[in-house]
Amino acid sequence: MTAEASVETLEAALLARAKRLAEEYLSRAQHSRDRIIEEANERLRLREEREILAAKAMAERVYRRQVQASELKLQGKLDRLRWEWVQAVVQNLSHQCKVLATDKSRYLPVLQRLLAAGAAAIEREELIAEINQQDLGRLQETWKTFAAEAVSDKCVVLSSEPLTCSGGVRVVSKDGRIRVDNTFEGRLERLAEELHQSIMERLFVPPSGLHG
């Protein structure tokens, strides 16, 4: 082989090797490009998923806040309505007590029962009964008989000082240290919470969409 042929053979070999290297580098570059694009697409997909999830979570929070605000608003309206109804019923009951006090035949037996209950609650033998001006006029002359029918085992003296109330009686121990307020107003005040609860249970059913 001549020197010229050897050079050509070497050049051909070098060129072939260069082509193989170029193809290898090109293939690697193509793989790298594909991998970069794939990773970029994956990052983009994950980012989009996170953004979608974040948007959904935000929408859910906004929705829950709107629902809670609506429920609170409705609850407030119901509470006001309930309070108005409770007040109306309590006022009506107070009015009925005042009407009862004007009907002597119905009222005096009730007054005797209130007197008996008040006297029974005080462990004293000598008691004082305080009633309003109207009842003083009715009972001052017949008090001993009236009181004895209600409380047979104790001495209940009628106070000459009228009590400010619509009806009923306040029973006081002789030394003034113990008092049982069985006036209509006193009993209504003590029973207010029980009355409110009873009225709420009778007039209202909790709405199924609300909790708490």
UniProtKB/Swiss-Prot annotation:
GO cellular component, one term: proton-transporting two-sector ATPase complex, catalytic domain
Coiled coil as UniProt keyword: no
Any single biological process term in GO: proton motive force-driven plasma membrane ATP synthesis
A single GO molecular function term of this UniProt record: proton-transporting ATP synthase activity, rotational mechanism
Keyword terms: ATP synthesis, Hydrogen ion transport, Ion transport, Transport
PANTHER family: ATPASE H+-TRANSPORTING V1 SUBUNIT E1A-RELATED (PTHR45715)
Role description: Produces ATP from ADP in the presence of a proton gradient across the membrane.
Family: Belongs to the V-ATPase E subunit family.
Protein name, UniProt field: V-type ATP synthase subunit E
Gene: atpE
